[in-house]
């Protein structure tokens, strides 16, 4: 068998998440990919993903691996798979790798981005599946949100920001950066969450806390107390799935990827008039 590494982009709107569900559980990215690989290989193929994105969450660069028969190794995998996959999934890179490569266990970092729609009034219809409409809450206190974001940087026990339903050995995670970027237009703001790894719905829970602070429903001191206490029951609500995108999965030296690239720029400091 030959090990194949895939980089995938997908629109999570109509998926029940990455991971295959029980019978009747809905359409999944993993399921679509395994069906396409089985067609090309003539046998069942198991796919392993770097992250298990939830229903409605998008990906720009999810990474997965699969073992394919040696006699099929020379196929133009990216083109062949994309031709078989539904229109809301694309293979952006495909290459053969060492047989011990593991998309999940070899990952040294991940970057997620969350997009907020900040203009009061209606969200543009074609943006609604990709943003959280916080404009309906009025103007957010961005300076307070940025001050709160600093609390999440470093190594912490994020038990208060993990949703139930996951059995993990430890809830301690190391986060390198939580920062605000310029959005794709004047009505949007993008937040970057960059770290070694994240707990179940942790990024959405962090975003929910930041918006609560921006709305004046909580303070940075409240969030600091919550982080120290580790009690999810006292935490603000979870941000909706559609604003979240898995932007990058990193391998090799930790923390060196996921930095601003082409088309990225930091947001203006809170209160800036430029």
From Swiss-Prot:
Enzyme nomenclature, EC number: 5.4.99.12
Record keywords, A-Z: Isomerase, tRNA processing
As given in the record, the signal peptide range reads none
Q: Which residues are responsible for catalysis?
A: 54
Q: Which reaction does it catalyse?
A: uridine(38/39/40) in tRNA = pseudouridine(38/39/40) in tRNA
Q: Which residues bind substrate?
A: 112
GO terms in the biological process aspect are: tRNA pseudouridine synthesis
Say if the entry is tagged with keyword Cell membrane. Answer: no
Gene Ontology MF annotations = RNA binding; tRNA pseudouridine(38-40) synthase activity
What is annotated about its quaternary structure and interactions?
Homodimer.
Similarity comment: family membership: Belongs to the tRNA pseudouridine synthase TruA family.
Q: What does this protein do?
A: Formation of pseudouridine at positions 38, 39 and 40 in the anticodon stem and loop of transfer RNAs.
The identity of this protein, by name, is: tRNA pseudouridine synthase A
Q: Which gene encodes it?
A: truA
